[in-house]
């Protein structure tokens, strides 16, 4: 079996990839297949599963959904990539101000948006794929 490449599936949490590696850089359009070839040169990557959620427009960035959709359409053209969607959940929470103004409440209400489903989807796909020997 010398020289045989290991058959490999890659599972990517898009939220963690973005905030851990891409946010604050000029890089946005990451070629997932090239990334896998770079980090796994001795493996045969047969599947890349990309776990994400569709973003909503924000007052400070109304074009964010269009940019995300363009990227998702692009990576869908890669033969090994499949996209699995979770969702975002927004709700009002109370948060403490970092520098409260004296004489005013140190608390404000904010809208907190959290990604839901990607972690569970990723774990479920990973276990199922291992079970069926993907």
Segments and roles (model prediction):
Residues 121-128:
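Acidic, metal-associated active-site segment
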Residues 1-114, 118-120:
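Domain-level signal for Mg2+-assisted phosphodiester chemistry and nucleotide/NA-binding surfaces
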Residues 129-134:
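Short, surface-exposed connector motifs at secondary-structure boundaries
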């Amino acid at each position: 079996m010398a020289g045989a490449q290991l058959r490999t599936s890659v599972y990517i949490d898009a939220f963690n990839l973005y905030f851990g590696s891409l946010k604050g850089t000029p890089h946005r359009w990451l070629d997932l297949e090239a990334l896998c070839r770079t980090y796994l040169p001795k493996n045969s990557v047969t599947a890349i599963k990309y776990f994400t959620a569709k973003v909503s427009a924000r007052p400070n960035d109304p074009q964010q959904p269009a940019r995300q959709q363009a990227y998702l359409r692009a990576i869908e053209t890669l033969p090994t990539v499949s996209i699995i969607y979770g969702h975002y959940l927004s709700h009002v929470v109370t948060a403490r101000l970092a520098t409260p103004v004296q004489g005013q409440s140190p608390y404000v209400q904010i809208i907190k948006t959290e990604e839901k489903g990607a972690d569970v989807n990723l774990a479920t796909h990973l276990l199922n794929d291992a079970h069926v020997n993907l």
